[in-house]
Amino acid sequence: FAFLAFPSLDLPMNENVRRNDYRAAAAPMKQPGETLTSMGLAPLTIAAATLGNTTDTARWLKDNISNDMLKPPFNVRTETPHNNTGYFLTGSAGFVQSLMYGLTGLRIEAAGLVQAYPPVLPPGWKSLTLTNITFRGEHYDITVARDASGTPRLHREPR
């Protein structure tokens, strides 16, 4: 099963199709006892955030940093909570993509790093700051913070 909404594809579609795509992919992962992979959690997080579904966004992020995904003594990321394969770089990159593409709503386009979707923050989060993000030779600090009304807003500052 492939996400049509995954950032590298991000095919044009109306919100109803995007929501159905997410539901079809997420439903099996929400079943009790389902073993999630650290890489599989990234597209779920991004798709939920793209839809503005903060509850599922928070769930997938939490699952990606808990459920024994990080193994002692150095907190290395494994592919699943039940193995000890050592450092799983793809899963770690997926987690970073969850933050970069999911929570910020940014996408890489020909015009540069553009805000394609509204930013989101999981319930209870006040802000998220990604520092020294380098894109096409430029350096940025990217922050998603709640405004006075509680709505997440994206701020990009050159370094």
Describe these PLM feature segments:
Residues T55-R159:
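Non-catalytic C-terminal accessory modules of carbohydrate-active enzymes
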Residues F1-S98, G102:
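Active-site core of glycosidic bond-cleaving carbohydrate-active enzymes
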